[in-house]
Regions:
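A hydrophobic C-terminal alpha-helical subdomain
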Residues: 18, 230-283
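Oxidoreductase cofactor-interface core, primarily capturing Rossmann-like NAD(P)-dependent enzymes
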Residues: 2-36, 41, 52-55, 62, ...
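Short secondary-structure boundary segments
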Residues: 71, 107, 260
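Cofactor-binding loops of NAD(P)H-dependent oxidoreductases
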Residues: 49
């Protein structure tokens, strides 16, 4: 059995489908109970487990051959740094000592040490903890998810404006989450000798102006980029419902991302899904 954490999101669902299509039994860990009728429909088994319930999670891992680990995002209304580190700690504790064939960990471009830099610091700690397990480990570091732009579609349609933290002419690596999940699923099934960090981005890099151009075609009206200056990032996050702690952490993460304070991989895996094809799924 292959266990998939986060299997109801874009990445986890694609990973689960990749493994299922290859003929393996798949159990997806969810926060809520999934109806039996839905389980029969997609062929996947579902286990409603709170990832902070370390003992129950370990019991599930003990029945598995291989595990895909995706740390669930915490509610931005709380302290995301604290809550996401709690789940990382629980997941790693549940994995420790379990005789698994292989573990694949979902991470991000720019993962680096840091207390208050959002996913960059949290997922770096997850990477380090996983690599300390006595198990073959693959780490998938993904570029900026194209799906992050989906939330802007309705506003672009209504106002003709794309608000963003990203400068309009600066190029950023981006990737469709479905391509990330497909790679994760392939690595989960690959030989145990295949380990280490695997970077993935899309077929091209894009600017926020490229995103606006695609949105223009999708919503049928001109869309202009409106850049939020760095001195207003914290305020913008707070206005979107983030707690003080989460807003500061995300603002710090955004700064590291925009100013590219990380090493770009020289030879990443290239997903096949373009910006426009991916955004059409959410339009």
């Amino acid at each position: 059995m292959y266990v998939i954490l986060g299997g109801t999101g874009h990445v986890g669902r694609a990973a689960a489908q990749t493994v299922l299509t290859a003929g393996h039994d798949v159990t997806v860990v969810t926060r809520q109970v999934v109806a039996a009728s839905e389980q029969r429909h997609d062929g996947v088994d579902y286990a409603a487990v709170d990832v902070n319930d370390t003992d129950t999670l370990r019991a599930l891992f003990q029945r598995a051959q291989r595990v895909f680990v995706l740390n669930p995002p915490a509610a931005v209304s709380g302290n995301t740094d604290v809550e996401e580190r709690k789940t990382v700690c629980s997941i790693l504790k549940a994995l420790r000592g379990v005789a698994l064939e292989k573990v694949v960990v979902q991470s991000t471009y720019g993962a680096q040490p840091g207390e208050h830099c959002g996913d960059l610091g949290v997922l770096y700690e997850l990477e380090q903890g996983a690599q300390a397990l006595n198990v073959p480990v693959c780490i998938v570091r993904a570029a900026y998810y194209i799906s992050n732009w989906a939330a802007a579609i309705s506003a672009a349609k209504a106002t003709g404006v794309l608000q963003t933290f990203l400068p309009p002419t600066q190029v950023f690596p981006m990737v469709a989450p479905e391509d990330v999940g497909s790679l994760a699923g392939q690595l989960l099934m690959s030989d145990v000798e295949e380990t280490g960090i695997h970077n993935i981005e899309g077929p091209e890099s894009y600017t926020s102006s490229d995103v606006a151009a695609v949105l223009s075609r999708l919503v049928g009206r001109a869309v202009q980029v409106q850049v939020i200056p760095q001195e207003r990032w914290y305020e913008a996050y707070r206005g979107s419902g983030f707690s003080k702690e989460a807003a500061q952490s995300y603002a710090n993460m955004t700064g590291l991302f925009v100013h590219q304070h990380y090493d770009r991989p020289a030879d990443p895996v290239r997903g096949s899904t373009s910006l426009e094809v991916c955004l059409k799924r959410y339009a």
